[in-house]
Amino acid sequence: MEAQLHAHLLHVVGGDFERARAQLQRWRRALARHIDIENHRLLPHLPEGARWPARLYLLEHERIALLADEYAERLDALLARLPRSQRARREAVLALLDAAHALRHLIEHHHQREEMALAHELPLAVQQAAWETGHGA
């Protein structure tokens, strides 16, 4: 998924907002599948006394999905009214990159939490089964 978001951002930097939207939509679908797998196939197996409760991961998933949707809305609004001047296009690119930064920061923080705790607290067999029947990590 990281590569998909990276590809999206490359389209943003290049000012190709149509391709950026298409790539963002693919990434958002992958994100939804990833969150669904974690919420329904991994978190129910989190042991009592885990470093962080399942509720925390669920709340982070909700926040990530919300930020992703808000970001997509910004891109859609831009596409509905494309900037005409070069300066306006550069300003639009910068605004999207700024918005993406907050989303990427939250995702990175969440991923670190998963690597520090969740990956060590769940049985390997549970993790493998979840991702084999899903889309992969």
Language-model features, listed with the residues they occupy:
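Small-residue-biased structural context
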Residues: 1-137
